[in-house]
């Protein structure tokens, strides 16, 4: 897409820095490679070799580590893969099964960036048989930027001509995305993990129009709700 106007960029940075939240899905981390503040806000993205640090998850020591100094970001073939929670006490991951199967999707590898104030929330093994790296790659992660929160997930691929929606209709992806949005907006998560959530070895699909595990909404008028949210966060961008 087109580069954002400078005014738009500055507004976005101020919004997050002053306490706002932002959620990025899949290829959104490919964007704005030459925008320094954006790279800091997303922590890791699809970048060329030698750009920032390449961060992976070290399973034996249960921690992130820097590796692959000259590798370029990429992905192998689309396939189902098992996601492992790495920050079980984080609001987004609380009560999420330790491991769960995600529907057929692109598994990004060799994500690179400044990686400042970054917490890896989940990872997945990138199989060499599928064109991957043979290492655990970050899947969902958080970056603290100023007073704000940025959540990035590399799940959620869909392309023109694709005949399946597995990556988007996976209940695991839908749950993590919904919880990420709530967390980015409020700093908290009240949306429960649904009973349809995938198991360790089995994928679970629900089309968006059939989702039943939505958050109950307030009966307050829109104006009242908006005013309350604005008081809680004066930097919030609200729509009716």
Feature map (PLM): residue ranges:
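Catalytic beta-strand/loop cores that center a nucleophilic Ser/Cys/Thr
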Residues: 44, 58-149, 208-226
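Structural detector of well-ordered beta-strand residues that form the stable sheet scaffold
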Residues: 19-23, 121, 151
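Oxidoreductase and adenylate-handling cofactor-binding alpha/beta cores
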Residues: 38-42, 98-104, 111-118, 156, ...
């Amino acid at each position: 897409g087109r580069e954002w106007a400078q005014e738009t960029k500055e507004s976005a940075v101020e919004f997050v820095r002053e306490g706002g939240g932002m959620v990025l899905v899949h290829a959104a981390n490919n964007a704005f490679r030459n925008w320094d503040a954006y790279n800091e806000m997303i922590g890791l993205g699809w970048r060329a070799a030698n750009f920032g640090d390449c961060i992976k998850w070290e399973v034996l020591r249960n921690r992130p580590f820097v590796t692959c100094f000259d590798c370029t970001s990429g992905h192998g073939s689309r396939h189902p893969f098992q996601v492992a929670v790495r920050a079980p006490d984080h609001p987004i991951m609380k009560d999420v099964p330790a491991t769960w199967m995600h529907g057929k999707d692109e598994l990004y590898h060799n994500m690179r960036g400044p990686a400042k104030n970054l917490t890896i929330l989940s990872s997945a093994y990138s199989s060499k048989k599928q064109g991957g790296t043979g290492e655990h790659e970050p899947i969902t992660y958080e970056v603290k930027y100023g007073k704000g929160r940025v959540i990035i997930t590399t799940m959620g691929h869909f392309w023109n001509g694709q005949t399946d929606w597995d990556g988007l209709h996976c209940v695991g992806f839908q749950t993590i995305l919904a919880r990420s949005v709530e967390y980015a907006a409020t700093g908290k998560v009240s949306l429960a993990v649904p009973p349809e959530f995938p198991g360790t070895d089995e994928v679970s699909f629900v089309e968006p129009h059939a989702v039943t595990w939505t958050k109950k909404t307030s009966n307050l008028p829109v104006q009242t709700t908006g005013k309350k949210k604005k008081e809680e966060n004066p930097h919030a961008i609200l729509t009716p």
